Amino acid sequence: MAGSDVKVTAISDEVAADDDFIVTASRPNTTATLANSSFASGGARKIQVTTTGTGDNEKTNTIIGTDVFGNTITEVITSTGSAEAVSGSKFFKTITSITSSAQFAANLKVGSTSDAAQEVHGNRVRLRGYSIVSGGSAGLVQFFDGTPEDGTEIFSARTIGTDNQTIDNTIPDEGILFPNGLSVVYTVGTIDRMNIFFS
């Protein structure tokens, strides 16, 4: 439309969860060697630490990286005394470093979960509408004012779980204001593509 100030952010994310995408099996004394530091989708993921030993209760891994808007964030993931996976709660777009509090009893690996987030726009915007192509599973797409960690969920949409079926919605009047920037949270496999319209 001529003269329109509406912009669009396109999100396509079918990158599966991978439990050793960031750190493959190793026993770092301090800082781990990173196999990868960002995701092919360009988005952010929750981080998961998996241990194989049973003597690692209360040992920690400190994750440093950036959030959906590129700001520096830190999270400490504490392992248990069992050989198991422990997931964090923050979304990392990039990973700068992972540092262990002590050497683990056996190999550990660090990867990503299927919980994902993406930036739509980092500044004040008005949401005008969205088009979501569903994946093979139903799930929520949550719209946050600000980051998922520190912002506020304004509303959510639900995919229908039928692969390649599209949901289109236009926000009436002046749209919905996101004064602290707009980000979305979703589960991989519930969306194939999203076009999010804002001004």
Spell out what each predicted region is.
Residues 1-199:
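Surface-exposed, low-hydrophobicity beta-strand/loop segments enriched in small/polar/acidic residues
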